[in-house]
Amino acid sequence: MSEQEKPIFTISVLVENKFGVLSRIAGLFSGRGYNIQALNVAPCEDPAYSRINIEVQEENEKLNHIIKQLDKLVNVVEVVDFRNVPTVYREVVLLRVRFGDKMHDIIDICNIFGAKVLDATHDTLTIECTGGVSRISRFLNLMADYPIDMLTRSGKIAVIKPKDNGPKPEAD
């Protein structure tokens, strides 16, 4: 199976917020030849713990193996596989774009996607856009028509949807 044919999965790993934990997790991936597509780490609801969201492009069987290996690591509290549970995904992109005489066009695109202009200079705008992965991709496809000086993406972050039948989240 080629790299393009392999699906991209998101795994969430709850870990003790201790020195070396991220290094051991990254080492597990690199030692087995698995490539991490995106990685996001931050303290969570309890500052003694961090949540690591990892995007990996791999076959199902190999992903199952990765999850089992992660579960065995010291300081790993919980591994969540988002493949079979209802999940809310979001991504954040920050970019700095040169606008020339197209500032209003860029702001129109931002308004369509609910993006925010965070900073402006005489020739650049710094923009934040948050949403589902396909929404971010559509936003970036339109922004590609303008000179982008710098771009950074968070990668997917995820939480499991609650089991109640409350209000539906906004569509992607």
Name every feature range the model reports, one short phrase each:
Residues 1-50, 55-172:
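Long, contiguous binding/interaction regions
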